[in-house]
Amino acid sequence: TAYEISTRDWSSDVCSSDLSHFCNSMEAINENQLKHLISLGISHHVDQTQLLAYGHDETEDFVFPPELVLIPKTPEEISKVLAYCHSEGIPVTPAGARTGLSGGALPIHGGVMISMEKFNQILHIDTDNLQVTTEPGVITEVLQQAVKAHGLFYPPDPASKGSCFIGGNVAENSGGPKAVKYGVTKDYVLNLEVVLPTGEIIWTGANVLKNATGYNLTQLLVGSEGTLGIITKIVLRLLPHPTHDVLFLVPFFDAATACAAVPAIFKAGIIPSGMEFMERDALLWAKAFTGDETVPVADTHQAHLLIELDGFDQDQLMREAEQLFAVLETFETDEILFADTAAQKSALWNLRRKVGEAVKTQSTYKEEDTVVPRFQLPNLLNHVKAVGKRYGFKSVCYGHAGDGNLHVNIIRGELSDAEWEHELPKAITEIFEEVIRLGGTISGEHGIGYVQRPYMPLAFPEVTLNLMREIKGVFDPKGILNPGKVF
């Protein structure tokens, strides 16, 4: 590797690819080190029950308990911890709300977990400059509602926005339905306060909209998945909040046709604020999970597009809606459902946001976060189904069709342990190879974390991966911070 990683080989896999339900983390802290870290006076957990609770996120099948959980309140406390762990070669895993889907917050090598749950204050809403300064432990939806009270808008809205932390969104470069019009987290981050793995505290940029001063460290930290530093303050730009929106649920008789309609809508000059794709089973499972009895799904409906338009002029929105209908008339669709009340809109969005949870109730599954140019969505969908036929698994697909981000859920169903453990990686590799061939990549918003590491060589040649390792080595010479993630 490009740098020495303490005295241990943190880069080796602790847990084999058999998707074990429980993985024993390495013992990385000796008794004297544990006593010293506890003596720092930071709130902590060492009870085994608590450690187990912190040892998982929303990734299917993995639990890696840390040896010590520290819950600091200030950057200076984090600095003391990291400086000591750097000197001792102790692995440190930063964690937010642990809602991630790639194992990014799993302490796979034991050691210390630093939980950011007490960094939960919105520090300043600047209504003149349309900015907000926040700590990373603020729940994303809480932040959105706080700025909305001032007529302002923070668009990125991952499905877990009601529970995830804004710091985790920055670490993962999270997206969500509104990314199709408004972009993802990186498009709103202006400046970050970060504690480096060696203990230094820095700001990465400036609280301005334009900055051509030196390397863009801010954007390097966004999406770095907790491997380069621990974010302690975030400055975000905001927008005026749209005053009007309209929402439509469009049923299609063929799933690939629904995907094909997506680029046609954009080609017509329409930029939706949301364009979500749901295969038949995705919507049916969400309806069953939520108890919905209002949204009709006919036997002939194979997929739906949930399309939102927003803006500041109701008449203009109606004109855009007419344009949208004109495009949809060129495809075979059934009767379009128009949500004309806030309650109806909320119910439709709730169905879409609950698809992921609904899938969990059906079977053991593996979710992939593929993204391709949106005109390639029909080809990707057809390939996923073809791979499923070859390997004998069912798949349920849904996601952010407007930006080509298709969540592929591989359902275990009746597959044997051997088939699931040994054939699944082959099937995923075939899907990812096609994604790359179509001009896409292996993760649009969930990140690489722990579970997607084996597939990184499909996305990048070795020279690029080595460059990433070199960057990691500059920030983290001993490789203590979130080891075993990304590459």
What are these regions, as identified by a protein language model?
Residues T1-D18:
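Single conserved hydrophobic/aromatic residue that forms the stacking wall/gate
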Residues S20-A83, G100-L130, A159, A282-T294, ...:
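N-terminal flexible segment immediately upstream of the FAD-binding catalytic core
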Residues V46-L52, L236, P240, V246-P251, ...:
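C-terminal substrate-recognition/cap domain of FAD-linked oxidoreductases
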Residues Q121-E276, L481:
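FAD-binding subdomain of flavoenzyme oxidoreductases
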Residues E200, R453-F487:
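Activity-critical C-terminal alpha-helical subdomain
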Residues I436-I448, P477-L481:
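Alpha-helix capping/hinge segments and adjacent helical runs
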